[in-house]
């Protein structure tokens, strides 16, 4: 290679020298532009800061000017605050821009000249950056926490500053667990709000055997003075209802103690709302004369009397309390926002051990201001919010807030057997209003005869319903398109109260607790749910999960903490419901039944439980419970006996209910038969009439036990007398198209509710009305001696009284029957006079039969009788001899001159019968027997000519009218009638009815006219369902004799 000549080298150096000045010039221009941009940004920022300071000064001036006019500034200032905060955010985003050229100096590090220039410019840049950073920190102090960015330098700085409040801000807030939008105190314009402090819980406290029942004491202190905050109105009670007038400051309030031993938990959960009846905006004002409020929370515990006597350190304690920890909360934060409407987590601190040095300030304030804060290893959860005071607060035995009146004592209420409206009528808004029920305590229940109103049960009807024990609420398990709600209606107004939503399928059963504060429901969605009966409570209180359908659920009568459920898996489960615990506890499972459990019931005391399954087996349990130890008592439940009757073996049991006397059990089975079983001898009485082969139907007994109601698959409600087994009434014209599923009788009123599960089926309520009963009695008097007809409605309602059954309001005929059985001597004395009267009546028979008519209603206020499947027909002479009231007999009408009544029907004995008991009557073939009443289909009560009386078989006799053509043969004991002879007397009967149906003038001298010869009597025979009435006349007898055979 050729060596380079000096000329070449010089030329190369000149080229380099020529290029170097151009590069230096470009770098210098870049530096100048960067510095100019920094200067412009700093100038703009300083200008913005000056503008903000000017605005702040203007705000202070405006506040002072408008201080006398209003407590709060106008909305324009709030708008200015929002604009200013937005501008701060924008400027903060632009501030980090100048740091970019500083972070990349690699462009200028190639030459020594550039390095020197950089060194000269560094102090100048650093001064600008320090000023910007310092101003950034000032701005960050005024920006809310949720809006300020967190650069790395700022984080390091905060960590370095905090020593004892490492995770807390200056307001005492450790963490905001439920963040709401920040609340500015200027936005709180509602003066009706008062301060409410909700104490939730703490984390686990430090293990200490001396802590057994902690509580929280809340102080409201002024930061300026260190004393309790002065009241806005000195005459207004803030902490206590009986607050003295000379107390002009806000007194502290304590929560209820949390007993670790009783509640079996070391994690205190008070969940208590403490209300300070002070104007809430007053505590949040930013004026100089207004207090700057700090809330202090002390966790305390009781000192026992032994500790107070023996412990010398008690002198340092206050009022016999052991101080465990304390916390504080500033209502107004350093960022200008209020620490309210959010669940806050406050750091707890140990109380100082040194004694108080300042007696003129609150002790907790001295801890906060003078003493070092030593962290306690736990936190406290609180929520502060403004509350609107309700217009009406129910009084209580003990006043729990400043607005609650203290009234009465438990001892007074027990002595007078009175309870507060808070206890007797939960869940009602107008519980102070007393309802006067028409049915008096101990009075017999009546059959409701008047339609009260209809209630909406949803698109698919109602499956079950039940009145509360106080009678003020009707709970109905309904079905709609969207779900299966429990609808609560107020009684007696029928007003809708609220819906309880939660079930996902059909609700089979529901039951009220003894105090009506809880309601339990069972459903085919595999759950049983417990609901609180409170005004604003619509959600589920407890859920009891099951593996399959739940058919029944009941509260134990002795305690509302126990719920018993019956499930499709043949298990009976006992659950404990505790208000302090989050979930229900399954105490025990009873696996005895071999098929799914359909129904469960208890007696009134709760000593016995009865469970029925799908194969007809009833198990009786001993279920005594000690209220103080519920779980242990449940483990001792045992089987008393099993009832396996052959009559309903294999037949599903739909419903069980204990009779009010506690000695009998109502059994509703799916064989269309109801039974009431005597639990002592296991003998049952049957009630037939209601069809039930497929559906689950609930029947019910009235609270007095004198009536039995049951629905049917034919849409009719049947009513029986449990004592006699007789059907006393039926509701035949109800508007139900589906099966009547459930019936509930009101516990304090003569009221009943019906429901059906079907498309748009309503809930019907009927009530007993005395005026309606009187109208029915007047209507039935026109039938003059006949019993109520099966198609007669009471005041266009659906209640029908069966022809063989009495009206539900009168018991006079029953008394007459009992009197007649017990006074046979009086009857024998009357017989002789009765025979003479009968002879007089027979002599006038022809005249009476010609003048019979029913064109005018009979006068007189006689009431409709009550009889037992029988006729009680006699004369006025018998009435006077027996000393009984006129209303005890059926439609006896008086004329102006002569009294005519239907005598007892006469029958003829067809066969001989010898009495086997003392109360029976011996008869011979051909004897004429006078029938007084018919006990049942097989046995009648009557007397023969000789004066002997007693019961005789009904199938041994025939009507005397069959022998009217040959009376001498009857006396000679003629042979039994042949079927041909039986049909002969019936032929003239039809023609005779036709002739008697024509209207004839009424003879005013005559008294009553027999119904058998009137148009109404004819209509009665047409409407009578399966009851045969033989009506014949005799030439020698003035009155028609009737015999009704009840099938």
Swiss-Prot record:
The modification Phosphoserine is found at residues 853, 974. Residues 1-40, 67-181, 963-1047 are annotated as: Disordered. It is found in: Cytoplasm, Cytoskeleton, Cilium basal body; Cytoplasm, Cytoskeleton, Microtubule organizing center, Centrosome, Centriole; Cell junction, Adherens junction. Disruption phenotype: Mutant mice, when surviving after birth, show retarded growth during the postnatal period, but do not develop severe cerebellar vermis hypoplasia or ataxia associated with cerebellar dysfunction. Adult homozygous knockout mice have a small body size, with slightly reduced brain size compared with wild-type and heterozygous littermates. The overall brain morphology appears normal except for a smaller cerebellum and underdeveloped vermis with a mildly defective foliation pattern. Vermian lobules VI and VII appear fused, whereas lobule V appears smaller and underdeveloped at 3 weeks of age. Is targeted by provirus integrations. This deregulation contributes to tumor development. It comes from the Eukaryota. Expressed in the retina (at protein level). Highly expressed in the brain. Highly expressed in the testis. Expressed in the kidney, thymus, heart, lung, spleen. Weakly expressed in the liver, stomach, pancreas, and embryo. Strongly expressed during periods of both cortical and cerebellar development. Residues 902-962 form the SH3 domain. It comes from Mus musculus (Mouse). Keywords: Cell junction, Cell projection, Cilium, Cilium biogenesis/degradation, Cytoplasm, Cytoskeleton, Developmental protein, Differentiation, Phosphoprotein, Repeat, SH3 domain, WD repeat. This is Jouberin. Self-associates. Part of the tectonic-like complex (also named B9 complex). Interacts with MKS1. Interacts with NPHP1; probably as heterodimers and/or AHI1(2):NPHP1(2) heterotetramers. Interacts (via SH3 domain) with the dynamin GTPase DNM2. Interacts with HAP1; probably as AHI1(2):HAP1(2) heterotetramers. Interacts with RAB8A. Interacts with CEND1. Interacts with SPATA7.
């Amino acid at each position: 290679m050729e060596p380079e000549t000096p000329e070449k080298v010089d030329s190369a150096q000149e080229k380099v020298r020529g290029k170097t000045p151009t590069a230096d010039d470009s770098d210098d221009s870049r530096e100048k532009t960067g510095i100019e941009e920094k200067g412009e940004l700093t100038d703009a920022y300083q200008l913005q800061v000056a503008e903000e300071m000017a605005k702040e000064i203007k705000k202070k001036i405006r506040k002072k000017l408008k201080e006398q006019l209003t407590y709060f500034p106008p909305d324009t200032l709030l708008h200015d605050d929002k604009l200013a905060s937005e501008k701060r955010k924008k400027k903060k985003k632009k501030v980090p821009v100048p740091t970019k050229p500083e972070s990349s100096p690699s462009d200028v590090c190639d030459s020594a000249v550039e390095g020197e220039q950089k060194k000269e410019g560094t102090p100048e840049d650093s001064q600008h950056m320090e000023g910007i950073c310092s101003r950034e920190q000032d701005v960050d102090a005024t920006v809310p926490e949720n809006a300020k960015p967190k650069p790395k330098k700022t984080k390091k700085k905060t960590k370095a500053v905090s020593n004892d409040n490492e995770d807390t801000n200056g307001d005492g807030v450790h963490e905001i667990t439920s963040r709401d939008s920040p609340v500015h105190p200027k936005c709180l314009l509602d003066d009706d709000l008062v301060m409410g402090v909700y104490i939730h819980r703490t984390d686990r406290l430090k293990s200490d055997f001396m802590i057994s029942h902690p509580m929280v004491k809340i102080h409201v202190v002024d930061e300026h003075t260190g004393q309790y905050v002065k009241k806005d109105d000195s005459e207004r009670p803030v902490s206590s209802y009986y607050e003295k007038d000379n107390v002009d400051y806000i007194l502290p309030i304590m929560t209820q103690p949390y007993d670790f031993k009783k509640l079996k938990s070391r994690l205190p959960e008070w969940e208590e709302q403490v209300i300070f009846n002070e104007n809430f905006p007053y505590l949040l004002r930013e004026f100089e004369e207004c207090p700057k409020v700090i809330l202090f929370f002390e966790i305390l515990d009781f000192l026992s009397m032994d500790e107070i006597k023996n412990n010398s350190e008690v002198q340092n304690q206050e009022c016999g309390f052991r101080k465990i920890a304390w916390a504080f909360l500033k209502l107004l934060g350093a960022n200008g926002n209020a620490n309210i409407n959010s669940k806050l987590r406050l750091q707890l601190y140990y109380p100082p051990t040194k004694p108080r040095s300042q007696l003129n300030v609150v002790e907790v304030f001295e801890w906060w201001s003078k003493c070092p804060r030593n962290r306690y290893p736990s936190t406290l959860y609180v929520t502060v919010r403004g509350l609107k005071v309700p217009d009406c607060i129910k009084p209580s035995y003990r006043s729990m807030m400043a607005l609650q009146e203290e009234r009465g004592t438990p001892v007074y209420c027990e002595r007078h057997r009175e309870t507060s409206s808070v206890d007797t009528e939960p869940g009602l808004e107008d519980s102070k209003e007393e309802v006067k029920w028409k049915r008096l305590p101990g009075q017999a229940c009546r059959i409701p005869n008047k339609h009260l109103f209809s209630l909406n049960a949803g698109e698919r009807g109602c499956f079950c319903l039940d009145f509360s024990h106080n009678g003020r609420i009707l709970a109905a398990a309904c079905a709609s398109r969207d779900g299966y709600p429990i609808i609560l209606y107020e009684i007696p107004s029928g007003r809708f109260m609220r819906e309880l939503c939660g079930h996902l399928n059909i609700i089979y059963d529901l039951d009220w607790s003894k105090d009506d504060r809880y309601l339990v429901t069972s459903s085919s969605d595999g759950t049983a749910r417990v609901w609180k009966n409170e005004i604003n409570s619509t959600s589920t209180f407890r859920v009891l999960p099951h593996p399959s359908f739940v058919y029944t659920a009941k509260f134990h009568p002795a305690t509302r903490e126990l719920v018993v459920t019956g499930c499709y898996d043949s298990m009976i489960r006992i659950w404990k419901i505790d208000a302090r615990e989050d979930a229900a506890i399954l105490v025990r499972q009873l696996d005895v039944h071999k098929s799914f459990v359909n129904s469960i019931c208890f007696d009134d005391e709760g000593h016995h439980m009865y469970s029925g399954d799908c194969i007809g087996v009833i198990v009786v349990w001993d279920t005594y419970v000690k209220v103080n130890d519920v779980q242990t008592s449940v483990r001792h439940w045992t089987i008393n006996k099993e009832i396996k009757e052959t009559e309903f073996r294999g037949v599903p049991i739909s419903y069980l209910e204990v009779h009010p006397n506690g000695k009998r059990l109502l059994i509703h089975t799916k064989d269309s038969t109801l039974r009431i079983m005597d639990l002592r001898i296991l003998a049952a009485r049957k009630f037939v009439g209601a069809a039930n082969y497929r559906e689950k139907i609930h029947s019910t007994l009235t609270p007095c036990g004198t009536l039995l109601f049951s629905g049917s698959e034919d849409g009719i409600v049947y009513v029986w007398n449990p004592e006699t087994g007789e059907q006393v009434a039926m509701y035949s014209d109800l508007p139900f198209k589906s099966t009547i599923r459930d019936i509930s009788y009101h516990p304090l009123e003569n009221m009943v509710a019906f429901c059906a599960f079907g498309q748009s089926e309503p809930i019907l309520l009927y009530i007993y009305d005395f005026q309606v009963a009187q109208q029915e009695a007047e209507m039935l008097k026109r039938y003059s001696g006949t019993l109520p007809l099966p198609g007669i409605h009471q005041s266009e309602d659906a209640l029908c009284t069966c022809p063989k059954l009495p009206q539900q309001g009168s018991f006079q005929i029953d008394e007459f029957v009992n009197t007649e059985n017990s006074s046979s001597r009086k009857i024998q004395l009357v017989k002789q006079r009765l025979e003479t009267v009968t002879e007089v009546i027979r002599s006038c028979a022809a005249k009476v039969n010609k003048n019979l008519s029913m064109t005018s209603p009979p006068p007189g206020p006689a009431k409709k009788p009550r009889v037992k499947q029988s006729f009680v027909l006699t004369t006025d002479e018998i009435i006077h001899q027996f000393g009984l009231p006129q209303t005890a007999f059926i439609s006896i009408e008086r004329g102006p001159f002569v009294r005519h009544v239907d005598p007892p029907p006469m029958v003829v004995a067809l066969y001989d019968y010898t009495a086997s008991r003392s109360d029976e009557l011996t008869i011979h073939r051909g004897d004429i027997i006078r029938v007084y009443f018919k006990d049942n289909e097989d046995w009648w009560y009557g007397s023969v000519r000789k004066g002997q009386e007693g019961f005789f078989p009904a199938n041994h006799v025939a009507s005397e009218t069959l022998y009217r053509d040959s009376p001498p043969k009857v006396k000679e004991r003629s042979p039994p009638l042949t079927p041909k002879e039986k049909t002969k007397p019936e032929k003239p009967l039809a023609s005779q009815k036709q002739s008697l149906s024509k209207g004839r003038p009424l003879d005013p001298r005559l008294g009553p006219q027999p119904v058998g010869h009137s148009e109404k009597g004819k209509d009665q025979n047409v409407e009578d369902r399966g009851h045969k009435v033989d009506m014949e006349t005799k030439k020698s007898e003035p009155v028609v004799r009737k015999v009704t055979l009840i099938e």
